[in-house]
Swiss-Prot record:
Subcellular compartments: Cell projection, Pseudopodium; Cytoplasm, Cytoskeleton
UniProt name for this protein: Major sperm protein 3
More about this protein: Around 30 MSP isoforms may exist in C.elegans.
Entry annotated with the keyword Disulfide bond: no
Source species: Caenorhabditis elegans
Record keyword Cytoplasm present: yes
PANTHER family: MAJOR SPERM PROTEIN (PTHR22920), MSP DOMAIN-CONTAINING PROTEIN-RELATED (PTHR22920:SF7)
Tissue specificity annotation: Sperm.
Superkingdom to which the source organism belongs: Eukaryota
N-acetylalanine, modified sites: 2
Protein encoded by which gene: msp-3
Keywords, sorted A to Z: Acetylation, Cell projection, Cytoplasm, Cytoskeleton
Length: 127
């Protein structure tokens, strides 16, 4: 059963943070790449700390071993300096898919007793 094996590693490009640059009076979109560097199929889901300001497309999916996906991270217009942006980040969560599961993302993979790994990517806003 896949759930008894801890999920392997993923890589993200960029690897440590996402940077948006001013002006913030229009929507910005930044692309990040998520790569499944493990030997098992994984399901991934992306969470944001500020759903009003930040969006991710596609927000979830399935990656085969060594497969990559390009995600569009969007930042809606906002009043820079007047809103708290200190804790903004996106979190990539991933888990092994069950053996024999279809290549269709299922939220319940994250709700059972299988191990879920997380990688945080802080958002930096340059004035």
């Amino acid at each position: 059963m896949a759930q008894s094996v801890p999920p392997g590693d993923i890589q993200t490009q960029p690897g440590t943070k996402i940077v948006f640059n001013a002006p913030y009076d229009d929507k910005h979109t930044y692309h990040i790449k998520v790569i499944n560097s493990s030997a098992r199929r994984i399901g991934y889901g992306i969470k944001t700390t500020n759903m009003k300001r930040l969006g991710v497309d596609p927000p979830c999916g399935v990656l085969d071993p060594k497969e990559a996906v390009l995600l569009a991270v969007s930042c809606d217009a906002f009043a820079f300096g007047q809103e708290d942006t200190n804790n903004d980040r996106i979190t990539v969560e991933w888990t092994n898919t069950p053996d024999g599961a279809a290549r269709q993302f299922r939220r319940e993979w994250f709700q059972g007793d299988g191990m879920v790994r997380r990688k945080n990517l802080p958002i930096e806003y340059n004035p």
